[in-house]
Amino acid sequence: MALMPLSLPFAELEVGHHLYWQIGDLYLHGQVFLSSWILIGILLAFVLVGTRGMKRDPIGLQNLLEFLWDFIRDLARDQIGEKYYRDWLPFIGTLFLFIFVSNWGGALIPWKIIELPEGELGAPTADINTTVAMALLVSLAYFYAGLSRKGLRFFELYVEPTPIMLPFKIIEEFTKPLSLSFRLFGNILADELAVGVLVYLVPLIVPLPVMLLGLFTSAIQALIFATLAAFYIGEGLHEAH
């Protein structure tokens, strides 16, 4: 007797079904750009509204924006140091806010109401291209910080405390962007898939705890990425001991 394949409701879930934009020989994931632009627009609108008619004693959105500013400033100062953190505050703040808004926007915004010819909108950070691009930017910032501060002496850290460490230090430079990108991508994609499967199976109450846990995890992932980015930049700026 032939065995028939079992049809499961979550078998219809697709991973990697994309809307492609072609520019010459280059293919871009169109839905990632669209969702990124929407989320950036929401963030800009939030900032513009919160900074309109600013008061000496902040209330409402202004109070929240000042809290975020203090939080990001303290994060950058703790990891980079008092002397250099101001130069890197915009970069660290942009990373944190974009990742945070992308993660939460992917979970809270009903993207399915926006129909596309192919694929569907979602969190930009659930696409490996987005997380790899940000991780490479962090690596470039690390090298720029070190070379601009120390010049060629920056490369001394690869042979300290002993030249035997050279191959391990080189491997470490490759593992930094890999760990940054895959940690963020894996957590956000796994959360989206888990919620998607539960919505198919039990569409009412059961997915809510998973969604709340996903929001908490998403915030933590934004914090981890920004903290590690600031730490790497601080590592490039300071003298090795």
From Swiss-Prot:
It is a multi-pass membrane protein. InterPro entries: ATP_syn_F0_a_bact/chloroplast (IPR045082), ATP_synth_F0_asu (IPR000568), ATP_synth_F0_asu_AS (IPR023011), F0_ATP_A_sf (IPR035908). GO terms for cellular component: plasma membrane-derived thylakoid membrane; proton-transporting ATP synthase complex. Keywords: ATP synthesis, CF(0), Hydrogen ion transport, Ion transport, Membrane, Thylakoid, Transmembrane, Transmembrane helix, Transport. GO terms for molecular function: proton-transporting ATP synthase activity, rotational mechanism. It is found in: Cellular thylakoid membrane. It comes from the Bacteria. F-type ATPases have 2 components, CF(1) - the catalytic core - and CF(0) - the membrane proton channel. CF(1) has five subunits: alpha(3), beta(3), gamma(1), delta(1), epsilon(1). CF(0) has four main subunits: a, b, b' and c. Belongs to the ATPase A chain family. This is ATP synthase subunit a. It comes from Synechococcus sp. (strain CC9902). The gene is atpB.
